[in-house]
């Protein structure tokens, strides 16, 4: 999937009238009509990750204490389709956004008679390692697959996490997300969600072309 780097600039006026939730629901409904091998089959496995970038919504950047920064937290399905995105300061611990990301996933129609609103499995890296949050996910009927902090690399989680890494790369093809120009967090957060909407739209467009 290739996304134009400057698509957000002409689309900026849409930020006030578009949101990730409504487009994700429409995408899933269209995919459900396209066949069983489309987006809905991937809602059983979700992957969570975050990336740090400059300017506020801000806290000290952990990688450069002299500069403020912000962080993009996203959750995707197993195909890399973004389902929810949250903007925080760069010094916010990843694990604090685990449950808010799960709660932000928009409800969409599942298979007939078996609506699926929550994932069955969530994959995440060491930044989300917390027994309290594992218990909270299990209480919701979600199986957490989260790397522990002291485990070596190569544990096998990477075969799932590369999907969300790719989605971060797609988002940062957009210059306004790769380089933060906005001082106001709400404006940058709107661009983040608009970027997710464009990825959803591009995914659906390519799925239609393959039919």
Curated annotation (Swiss-Prot):
Q: Which cysteines are joined by disulfide bonds?
A: none
A molecular-function term among this protein's GO annotations: transposase activity
Residue ranges of the region described as Disordered: 51-71
Q: Which UniProt keywords apply?
A: DNA recombination, DNA-binding, Transposable element, Transposition
Q: Does the keyword DNA-binding apply?
A: yes
Q: Does the keyword Zinc apply?
A: no
For biological process, the GO terms are: DNA transposition
Q: Where are the transmembrane segments?
A: none
Q: Write out the function statement from the record.
A: Involved in the transposition of the insertion sequence.
Which family does the record assign? Belongs to the transposase 11 family.
- Name assigned to this protein: Putative transposase for insertion sequence element IS402
Native source organism of the sequence = Burkholderia cepacia (Pseudomonas cepacia)
Q: What is the lineage of its organism?
A: Bacteria, Pseudomonadati, Pseudomonadota, Betaproteobacteria, Burkholderiales
């Amino acid at each position: 999937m290739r996304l134009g780097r400057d698509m957000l600039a002409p689309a900026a006026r849409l930020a006030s009238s578009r949101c990730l939730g409504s487009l994700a629901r429409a995408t899933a409904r269209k995919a459900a009509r396209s066949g069983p091998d489309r987006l809905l089959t991937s809602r059983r496995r979700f992957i969570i990750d975050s990336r740090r970038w400059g300017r506020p919504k801000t806290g000290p950047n952990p990688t450069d204490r002299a500069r403020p920064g912000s962080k993009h937290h996203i959750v995707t399905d197993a195909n890399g389709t973004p389902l929810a995105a949250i903007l925080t300061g760069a010094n916010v611990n990843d694990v604090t956004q685990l449950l808010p990301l799960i709660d932000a996933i928009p409800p969409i129609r599942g298979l007939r008679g078996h609506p699926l609103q929550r994932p069955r499995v969530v994959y995440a890296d060491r930044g989300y390692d917390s027994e309290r949050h594992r218990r909270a996910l299990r209480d919701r009927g979600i199986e957490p697959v989260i790397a522990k902090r002291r485990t070596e690399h190569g544990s096998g989680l990477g075969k799932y996490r590369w999907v969300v890494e790719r989605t971060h790369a797609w988002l940062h093809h957009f210059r306004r997300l790769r380089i933060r120009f906005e001082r106001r967090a709400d404006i940058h957060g709107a661009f983040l969600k608009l970027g997710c909407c464009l990825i959803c739209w591009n995914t659906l467009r390519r799925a239609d072309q393959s039919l």
